[in-house]
Each structure stands twice: as structure tokens, then as C-alpha cells.
Amino acid sequence: MIELVLTILDLGMILVLLYMADESNKENESHAMMASLLSASFHVALMYIILYMPNLRVIPMGYFSLLGLAVLLLLIPRKPNLSALIGIRGYVIGDPPRPDERDSVTRRYRLVKGTPEYEEYYLRHPEREEIDRVHRKLNRIDGTIDGGYRPNVSMIDASFSIPPHMKGIAFAEPRKEPYDISPEKSTVIAKGLANHLGAKVVGVCKVDPLCVYTNQRTLWEKTWTVDGEEQGYPPYALVMATEMSHTHVHAGPHTPTAAETGNQYANGSYISTVMAHWFSGMGYTGIAEHTGHYDVVLPPLAVQAGMGEIGRNGYLITPTLGSRVRLSAVLTDMPLVVDEPIDIAVEEFCENCMKCADTCPSDSIPTTEKTEYNGTLRWKLEAETCSAYWNQVGTDCAICMAICPYSKPDTPLHGVIRWLVNHSWLAPKVFPLMDDILYGKNWKVKPVPEWLDWKD
């Protein structure tokens, strides 16, 4: 009887490990594939002991007893993160100001010296003027790291040329009388349409003032609105995330990653614009929020919409796609059913995982605990050094997005791991170490298809 039980357990482990090896091979994860195959070989040796060396069966019995204990420990539920379940307000410890869009490095690089907007901003932030002056001259996404490889750089330019065209039609006024429909039904339709158009994750929230910019300058405009009068923003936001290709992202910091960034920003501008005009046709206001037109900060808005949590790398981390997403949204006054913020153990996992910080080529990601910044607890990135590296390589890097353990493909195997991290007391503590063992601690660029290969 013991022999049969041990045989079944060991055979099951062999099959699981071979499945892991196959999945790792498909993901171009050679380190994980070899680790899985070596583990499978160990279990083949155990099978030999079980079947042909009865005097040594105490070894597999002890091994599976320890394995069973580990499984039981993994099944101990963790305590919920109450701050995460509150949303962005759960991390407020002071009186946070509303965000100024000029605090975003890529936005303020477009400030023109001698204008009132320039003088007013650097009067308040003199420490940023000189470093911004240097970086402003270098600000580019031109594929320097790949020698400006034209096919890929042209992909980047082509995709980023789309959002400016969408900007002019971002605001959609009601075209008809409001359609008589319940909030429940309208929410189902809006989410379904957004999914159909290409959004992989969709959520709804009330627009929190902490997400609304005070000083706006959309990326493609030439003038700022400086401390202007308060505008009445629609109360609801439909927030959408499109998926960044796993293959493209794992080529970071090379040009395929930047090409995919442009592609998903273009997709987001299209989806949000279509959704804005759908709300318009339903008799309500729709304002598309995308890389060509921002009124709000999208990551915290997505947190409010129950789409994920903000990780150590500063990105929104979603339950199924991790950091591999780009965000867009629509502000509307159409009554919708709001989602609640979620807790997927990101904070606890990131506290035990330094992978993004350790591999960041510009050391821009903190290795410390969350600290207070503008009245909220957060992992504050060094945006200036991050941007300087972008300028150096001529892409948007994305190594931190790619190496994040949450960013693995949405497969059954990784789904089980995500479920355990979300529910287990032990998993967020030990799985960062397991990820290092299986996938390695250091960043390694993965191969890309021939049509994306920058190496002539």
C-alpha cells in the first residue's frame, strides 16, 4: 500500500515537473526549464528507490512527508491588507496635494524656458532645473542601444503617431437624450465593449480628486493651464488595461519593448476614444484619457477601479498580467456600478522581493520600505535617473516590468502560483526566493522572432 501511494505521488510530481519544463521552454525560460528537468530527474531516481529498493523507502517517505507539511503551511490563509482594500486613501498619512502633471519627467521636459509656466514651476522646484535642462536636450526614443535599427524605430514612431490624432476627439459631448438604462446593465455593456475592443482588464470607479491633475499639459499641446479654475469632471471612470506582449517586453531594454509600448498606447487611445463616443451616443459625456490626452493619473485610478495594486516598480500590478499592461480610461457622467479596490498581496510580496530594484540599470527603484511622499506612503522611484537611462539607450527600458514575477504569462501554471500568493500566509514570503531559484536573479534578454530581431 505504501509503495502504491509513493508511486502515485512521485509519478504525479514527475508529470508536473515535465509540464513546468515544457511551459518554461515555451516562455524561453531556459533556467527554469533546466531546473524543472533536474527536479524531474531527482524524482525518477526516487521512483527507482520506491520500486526496487524497499530498504531505502524511508527516504521518499520522509521527502513526501516534508512536502506535505510544506503544502499544509502554504494553505494557511494570510490576513487581508486592509490598506489595499481601501484603495489609494488607505495609504494617506497626511494632507496630500492633487498631482501636478509637470511633476512627471516626460511632461516637464516640454516646458519652454522664458514662459510663465517654466518660471513658475522651477521657482518652486529649483533643484530640478539644471538636471532637467541636461535631460531635455537628450530626451528621445530613437533606439540608440540597437544602433537606431530603422525597422523597429519606425514601428515605435508609427505607433506613437496615433494618439495625437485621437486627442482632438477625446472629448465627446452627449449627442442625444440620455438612454433609459440601469447602471447594472450599462456597466455590463461598457465592460463588454471595452473587452471586445481589446482591453484585457476593465474596472469602474468614482473619480477621486487625488487622481485629477491640477496643472495639465497633455503631451502634444504647446500651452499649459496654470492654476486655472476648477473644472467639473464627470464622476465616473471606466479604466482599461491592454496587455503588453510577453515576448516584446522580455527584449528590454531593446527596441521591441518600446515598439510594444507605442503599440499599446495607440490601442489605448483608440479604445478609450471609441468608448468615449459610445457614452456620447448613449446621451452622456465621455472624455478619453490616454497618452495623448491626460486629465487624470491612471495607475491610482486603476487601483480605485479594482484592477490591481501599485508595486515596488511603480507600475500597476494586475492579478493575471502583472505589470505588463498599459492603461487608458474614459471619464463619464453615465451612472455605473463601481468596483472595489482589491488586495492581491502585492505589498507583502514586494516587501520580500527586490528583483526589480536589484536589476534596475539606473538604480532608480528603492530597496527600502515604503516612505512618505506628498502625504502618502509609497515606493518612490527616482524618475530623473530612470529617464536619464531611457535617454541613454533610446528606449523605455521596461526591465522592471519584465522581471517582475507577477508578469509571467497568464497560464494555468502561473495562475496556481498567483492564487497561492494571493491567499497564502507563506507564499508571499518564500515565492520571491523560489522565483530566483527557478528563473535566476539577474536580467537576461530573451530572444525575439526574426521580424523583431535588431541584430542584422
Where are these regions (language model features)?
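Membrane-helix boundary elements
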Residues: 1-2, 316
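Flanking helices and flexible, charged tails adjoining ferredoxin-like Fe-S electron-transfer domains
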Residues: 2, 6, 10, 14-17, ...
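Non-catalytic, usually N-terminal nucleic-acid engagement modules in DNA/RNA processing proteins
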Residues: 2-247, 254
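Glycine-centered secondary-structure boundary/capping sites
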Residues: 28, 301-307, 442-444
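Amphipathic repeat-derived elements
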Residues: 153-179, 311, 316-333, 452-453
